[in-house]
UniProtKB/Swiss-Prot annotation:
Belongs to the UreF family. One of its GO terms (molecular function) is nickel cation binding. Required for maturation of urease via the functional incorporation of the urease nickel metallocenter. The keyword NADP does not apply. Pfam families: UreF. It comes from Rhizobium meliloti (strain 1021). Keywords: Chaperone, Cytoplasm, Nickel insertion. InterPro entries: UreF, UreF_sf. It is found in: Cytoplasm. This is Urease accessory protein UreF.
Length: 223
């Protein structure tokens, strides 16, 4: 019985965080397109360093903590509202704010195919990591598993952006994902044990890239 529940949770996480899930994540780069344009990321090694820095010290780390808060607060509407508002406040640019809010709205709409009575999400608008955490929490997928799946999907999307911008190929991109498995797992474990008191970022170059992308003339991505 427990094995069946674990398999069901795995299938749900794979589906919810698949590129095929209709949230439109393919259209966002989180400022990576600007970094590529500015030649801050020119190949697979640069891409890995960019992703690892965001995982350890940047927006991806903060998103992990916000997901964990959404997971724990899945049946507490007031706490979910506060978490989502905090996520909005942490968005360092107009485009980052747009990305997290539109992804969150689309995720909640699509996740409606998995309704749950205990999910107390007010309205249909929330920051993306909080929305993912709340839905995963309502369905008891396991917090660390949800974090690992979310972080892996985030890094996978960055690889997809880099491939489409022509700075790495598919083979090198997949190789990077393989090499980052331990890092992703370690960050997921650390985020499970952390709290909102551990929020914080020190990735100023990534923040500036997101801001500069707002005036990038020729672009493939919305952010």
């Amino acid at each position: 019985m427990a094995e069946h529940a674990d398999t069901q949770s795995l299938l749900r996480l794979v589906t919810w965080l698949s590129p095929a899930f209709p949230v439109g994540s393919f259209s966002y780069s989180g400022g990576l397109e600007q970094a590529i344009h500015d030649r801050l990321v020119t190949g697979a090694d640069d891409l890995r360093l960019w992703c690892e820095t965001l995982l350890d010290h940047g927006t991806t780390w903060n998103d992990a903590l916000l997901l964990a808060e959404g997971y724990r607060a899945c049946d507490d509407a007031a706490r979910l509202i506060a978490a989502s508002e905090l996520a909005e406040a942490l968005a360092g640019s107009r485009e980052w704010h747009m990305e997290t809010m539109l992804l969150g709205e689309a995720f909640l709409a699509a996740a409606g195919h998995w309704p749950h009575a205990s999910l107390e999400f007010p309205g249909a608008r929330a920051a993306y990591p909080v929305a993912v955490g709340a839905v995963a929490g309502a369905h008891r997928t396991g917090l660390e598993a949800a974090l690992a799946a979310f972080l892996n999907a985030t890094i996978s999307n960055a690889v997809s952006v880099a491939i489409r911008c022509g700075v790495t190929g598919q083979r090198d991109g997949v190789g990077m994902l393989a090499r980052m498995e331990k890092t992703i797992g370690a960050v997921a474990t650390r985020a499970t044990r952390a709290s909102l008191d551990d929020l914080g970022a020190a990735t100023i170059i990534a923040d500036i890239a997101s801001l500069r992308h707002e005036i990038l003339h020729s672009r493939l991505f919305r952010t």
